[in-house]
Design a protein with these regions (language model features):
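Leu/Val/Ala/Ile-rich N-terminal alpha-helices, chiefly Sec-type signal peptides and the beginnings
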Residues: 1-48
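Charged linear interaction tracts used for macromolecular binding and regulation
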Residues: 45-129
C-alpha cells in the first residue's frame, strides 16, 4: 500500500475523511489530531513519571497542540488549491502521524523523545506539504 493511500489511515482513524471541501478538511484535521492526542495522552499516563524534563515538556506541548486547531494550518488548508498530488502529500503526512502515534503506544520512556520530535516535525510538514 502506497504511503499516500488513504485506506491505511481510514482503517486506523475513525471518520477520517478526505480533503474534498472545507468541512471535510476541518473534520479530517480534527479526527487526526484526536487520534494522535489520545496516543500521546496514553503515553503520558503510562510512562509520564519516568520522563526527563525535556521529554515531558515536549509531550505536554504536543498534547496541547492536538487539543486545538493549528490556525496556520487551517488557514493554509482553507485557501489551498488541493490538486491530487497535494492531497497525496497530505495523506502521506497523515499516515506518518498515524504510524508515529501507534509507535508511541508501545514506546518506553527512553525512546519517547525521538518519536515526539518526529511527530512535531510531521505536524510542521502538514502546514506546507510538497507534492508526492
Amino acid at each position: 500500500m502506497a504511503d499516500d493511500d488513504p485506506a491505511y489511515v481510514r482503517a486506523r482513524v475513525p471518520d477520517y475523511a478526505d480533503y474534498a471541501d472545507e468541512a471535510s478538511r476541518h473534520h479530517t484535521d480534527l479526527v487526526l489530531r484526536t487520534f494522535v492526542g489520545e496516543h500521546l495522552n496514553d503515553a503520558r499516563q503510562r510512562v509520564g513519571d519516568e520522563l526527563d524534563e525535556r521529554t515531558s515538556k515536549t509531550l505536554d506541548e504536543l498534547i496541547l497542540h492536538c487539543q486545538f486547531t493549528d490556525q496556520a494550518f487551517i488557514h493554509w488548508l482553507d485557501h489551498a488549491r488541493l490538486d491530487p498530488p497535494l492531497v497525496a502529500s497530505l495523506v502521506a503526512i497523515d499516515r506518518r502521524l498515524v504510524e508515529l502515534a501507534e509507535r508511541v503506544k508501545d514506546a518506553n520512556a527512553s525512546d519517547l523523545h525521538d518519536l515526539l520530535e518526529a511527530i512535531d516535525i510531521a505536524f510542521e510538514h502538514r502546514r506546507e506539504p510538497l507534492p508526492a
